[in-house]
Amino acid sequence: MTDPATTMSWVQVIVLSVVQGLTEFLPVSSSGHLRIVSQLFWGEDAGASFTAVIQLGTELAVLVFFAKDIWRILTAWFAGLADKSKRNFDYRMGWMVIAGTIPVGLAGVLLKDLIRENFRNLWITATVLILFSLVFILAERRGKKTRGFEELTMKDAVLMGLWQCLALIPGVSRSGGTISGGLFLNLDREVATRFSFLLAIPAVLASGLFSLPDAFDPQAGQAASGLQLLVGSGIGFVVGYISIAWLLKFVSNHSFAWFAAYRIPLGLLVMALLGTGVMAA
């Protein structure tokens, strides 16, 4: 259990919210970065609950950025429920998002205590940052990247949903896990990225709402006021929206493995800081 801590300062809220917005959609692990920055500059963990709540801001960025896609999928899904003749690809996509969300939903509930306490050790975060970078490189090399968006199947959705479960460990990255899974399934890099965003919507939204009461409790990390959470979510929204646009443009003509070139040195740096006592795990 995290020891009771002081309330968060505004500087801390702003810095962590910018970090959240920048890293939530990049395959570098937002939870890992928040954990590292909190410990390095403030000497304590902001907490999994604070992280989950400010993710609601970045979640809103996804909803706005993909509003047309989401609306098309939702209307097709409801139309398909009412009329079998209207069951097109978007109708099936609705079911794929639901099916892909079930694994991480079950894992999140069953492993809640483990996620909030044991998994947040910085030695684990640093190690995973390095090891999962190798998965990125392997996914890029093994994946044929030939399958388009309309070639997605229910099997793909479930398998990518299982990959998303790995993101419960700080250092993996939600997008990193699901996109890697998509590449191993031979999906085009941009297709895997777009579906990764859609797949994250229910999971992140549920996680943020579920963690909202705990975000005010110092026992769950540092306590934040309602206004701080609101401002933090707003910052996360703006920075997150920019991050989404940049990532989709980047992956269209750049290897996913480039992120490993950032993650591996970061993991080694964190290990060095832990080993020398500059940071506590």
UniProtKB/Swiss-Prot annotation:
GO terms assigned for molecular function: undecaprenyl-diphosphatase activity
Biological process, per Gene Ontology: cell wall organization; peptidoglycan biosynthetic process; regulation of cell shape; response to antibiotic
Transmembrane segments: 95-115, 119-139, 152-172, 195-215, 227-247, 256-276
Gene Ontology cellular component list: plasma membrane
Cellular localization per UniProt: Cell membrane
Pfam families cross-referenced by the UniProt entry: BacA
Keyword field contains Cell membrane: yes
Entry keywords, A to Z: Antibiotic resistance, Cell membrane, Cell shape, Cell wall biogenesis/degradation, Hydrolase, Membrane, Peptidoglycan synthesis, Transmembrane, Transmembrane helix
HAMAP family assigned: Undec_diphosphatase
Family membership noted in the UniProt record: Belongs to the UppP family.
NCBIfam families for the chain: PRK00281.2-1, undec_PP_bacA
Note: Bacitracin is thought to be involved in the inhibition of peptidoglycan synthesis by sequestering undecaprenyl diphosphate, thereby reducing the pool of lipid carrier available.
Function: Catalyzes the dephosphorylation of undecaprenyl diphosphate (UPP). Confers resistance to bacitracin.
PANTHER family on file: UNDECAPRENYL-DIPHOSPHATASE
Listed name of the protein: Undecaprenyl-diphosphatase 1
Lineage: Bacteria, Bacillati, Actinomycetota, Actinomycetes, Mycobacteriales
